[in-house]
Amino acid sequence: SKSDWEEALKDQDAIVHYAAETGTGQSMYEVEKYVDVNINGTALMLNLLVNGSYNVKKVIVASSRSIYGEGKYISKELGAVYPTQRESIHMDQGDFEVKYPNSSALTLVGTDEESKIHPSSVYGITKQNQEQMVLTVCPTVGIAGVAFRYQNVYGPGQSLKNPYTGILSIFSTQIKNGNNINIFEDGLESRDFVYVDDVVEATILGIEKDEANYEVFNVGLGEAIDVNTVA
């Protein structure tokens, strides 16, 4: 709410904006909620910074890997490509590979900050909007904006009840309850998992270092780990 933001912004030099609804799947059937909390909530913060009197000098916004959609791949025929969502007709046949028109098999490569942005969920769209608003509005009032595109964060304090916090929390809950771990598809889909302490360290550096101002950073381990390995 406006009053919450007004209280949060008082006497602060820097704001680390984590307030958001999370969950790519959930966002597809709770569209209004995600847009209202993530986009409108960020707009409310920025509106206060623009029109109020605060001491804030820097805003760090928590973005997400989800803004890249399926990510970056290399095609022998076409070079770097950015596939859209996989089609159910292929997945129903047990074919879980990402495809691209007029291309043979694709090779997954690291998705850097210069890669194409094309979110495949409402959640991803809202995170893209959040970072663009912060990086666009903040400089107009002398505030440095920084966007961190966090990968799959895990560690102490992570909810084991919320199914939208990622597979590590889901697997942990299954193990804790003495259940078998269910792996969907072929288990070869991969993610970059980053420990929460590393995320905290990166975020602190973003606050302290002027070199981070007005920049976008991926925050991850830099290593693809497939689901079978995690399990």
Q: Residue ranges of each PLM-predicted region?
A:
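N-terminal Rossmann-like NAD(P)+-binding domain of SDR-like oxidoreductases, especially those catalyzing
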Residues: 1-151
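CheY-like receiver
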Residues: 7-8, 174, 202
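Residue-level signal for the nucleotide or nucleotide-sugar donor/cofactor binding architecture
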Residues: 29, 37-40, 114, 121, ...
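Generic structural signal for alpha-helix termini and adjacent loop/cap motifs
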Residues: 30, 48, 52, 174, ...
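Short aromatic-enriched loop/helix-cap "lid" or pocket-rim segments at secondary-structure transitions
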Residues: 70-75, 158-162, 230-231
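Glycine/proline-rich active-site loop of Rossmann-fold NAD(P)-dependent oxidoreductases
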Residues: 128, 141-143, 153-169, 177-179, ...
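Hydrophobic alpha-helix immediately C-terminal to the catalytic Tyr-X-X-X-Lys motif of short-chain
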Residues: 129, 133, 137, 167, ...
